[in-house]
């Protein structure tokens, strides 16, 4: 059965307004009150009783709940998504860069190779909320592929899914390697049917922060269901040494109404509120940031208590601005560089209240 046609699965549904029951993150409460005055955020961190006292809930008829869904994630008592059940852990994913396998060609150039497999896989995006995803290599987002400018890249794609798929890389490459339906059929490229395979091969250019995704229609469905990943091309001379992080801003339409009910960085709502990202005071931190959010026109990243240098698309070694908030439309990406001069816990989140309420919120734990 095509999971897209299953419009009303009780275990998948979630409304945007009926949010979270309590995150058990008491240390976050003082910062939280400065974020947004909305009751759902206080529910997520402080529990229903305290939230009701501070922000009484307005009367809302059940029929007005978006999507009409009854099931929703429950964070009460510190409930969390089990990374082992999903087969991937956002705490590990944030520093996981896949360099593939390399060998020298006769010309002396480095050949870097990967294998990506598309599959159908149910994942949990919030406690009790299962989602019928399409994945590359068993995870959402797919592996963060990393290489160096000028290398020869070879990506073997195997479609193990029940649907036709491709891989479209952002970068400079021949038309046959574009992963675009209608370009390459008859030569093994274009749309790759279930059970089929194709090898994409091209030069790593230009350097910067890029990404890849399926390009089969309906495009919104293939992206929203999880077929995407980050693709980093390092400059030939590299970048200054840093603690490097990958953050993919995404979301999930859990009741299939073309509107997201869960927002996140690296797939699991509120994961980095439960498990803050640990960094060292005064150490250079580099964040590779990608917005692949479907159904919403824009996303944003804001950090508390600090500013960062921003390099749009990462194709220049000089930052474009020094700020604490940036916006990205779908497919936009960039590199953020910063140092934390103070120890302690600092929040980062989407500077759109609804996204933060529904999972796109976390913390840095600065040590030293």
List where the protein language model places each region.
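N-terminal secretory signal peptides
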Residues: 1-18, 22-29, 33, 41-43
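C-terminal segment of N-terminal export signals and the immediately downstream linker at the start
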Residues: 12-13, 33-106
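Short, glycine/small-residue-enriched coil/turn segments at secondary-structure junctions
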Residues: 105-106, 140-153, 272-284
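Short amphipathic
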Residues: 112-119, 243-249
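Histidine- and aromatic-enriched segments that form or immediately flank copper-ligand environments
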Residues: 113-231, 295-329, 349-365
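Exposed beta-strand face motif in extracellular beta-rich ectodomains
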Residues: 208-210, 285, 344-346
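Low-complexity, Pro/Ser/Thr- and charge-rich linker/hinge segments at domain boundaries
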Residues: 232-248
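Acidic-aromatic/histidine active-site loop/patch
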Residues: 244-281
